[in-house]
C-alpha cells in the first residue's frame, strides 16, 4: 500500500553505475545486521513493511516499458529505484554497513506519473511513509550501536 516501507534484501543491478566498480556477478546485498535492525524497528513501532528484492535502474520514474516492470514483478522484485544497487555494492566493497528503506510512492499496476505527482504534491499517505522511513532508520542506528 502507498506509504508502506520496503526493506530491500537484495538489488538487481540494472543501474549501470555499479558496473563501473565491479563485475556484474558481484551481489548487491545489504548488511544483515543493519537490515535486521530496520525490521526490528518497524515491528516495534507497528509500521507496515515488506521485505524483498528491488530492481535498481537508470531511469527516473519511467513507465514507458510496462512489460519490463511486469517481467521483474514475475521474478518477485517488489520495488524499483535508482540507488540501492550501487549503495549496496559500494558499501560492501568499502566495508560500510548499508541498508535500503524504500517508501511505496507508486502502486503496482497504477500510473507511475499520477502516483509520483501525488507524492510531489505532498499527499499525506506518501509523506507519512517518508517520515516512517526516517524514524525507522534512526531507530535502527541506535539498535546496532547497543
Language model: regions and residue ranges:
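Glycine-rich phosphate- or other oxyanion-binding loops that anchor nucleotides, phosphorylated ligands
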Residues: 1-146
Amino acid at each position: 500500500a502507498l506509504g508502506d516501507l520496503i526493506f530491500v534484501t537484495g538489488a538487481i543491478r540494472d543501474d549501470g553505475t555499479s558496473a563501473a566498480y565491479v563485475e556484474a556477478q558481484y551481489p548487491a546485498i545489504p548488511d544483515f545486521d543493519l537490515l535486521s535492525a530496520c525490521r526490528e524497528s518497524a515491528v516495534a513501532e507497528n509500521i507496515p513493511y515488506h521485505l524483498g528484492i528491488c530492481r535498481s535502474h537508470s531511469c527516473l520514474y519511467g513507465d514507458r516499458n510496462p512489460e519490463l516492470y511486469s517481467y521483474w514483478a514475475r521474478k518477485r522484485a517488489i520495488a524499483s529505484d535508482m540507488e540501492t544497487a550501487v549503495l549496496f555494492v559500494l558499501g560492501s566493497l568499502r566495508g560500510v554497513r548499508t541498508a535500503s528503506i524504500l517508501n511505496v510512492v507508486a502502486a503496482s499496476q497504477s500510473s507511475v506519473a499520477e502516483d509520483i505527482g501525488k507524492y510531489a504534491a505532498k499527499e499525506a499517505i506518501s509523506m507519512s511513509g517518508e517520515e516512517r522511513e526516517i524514524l525507522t532508520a534512526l531507530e535502527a542506528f541506535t539498535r546496532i550501536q547497543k
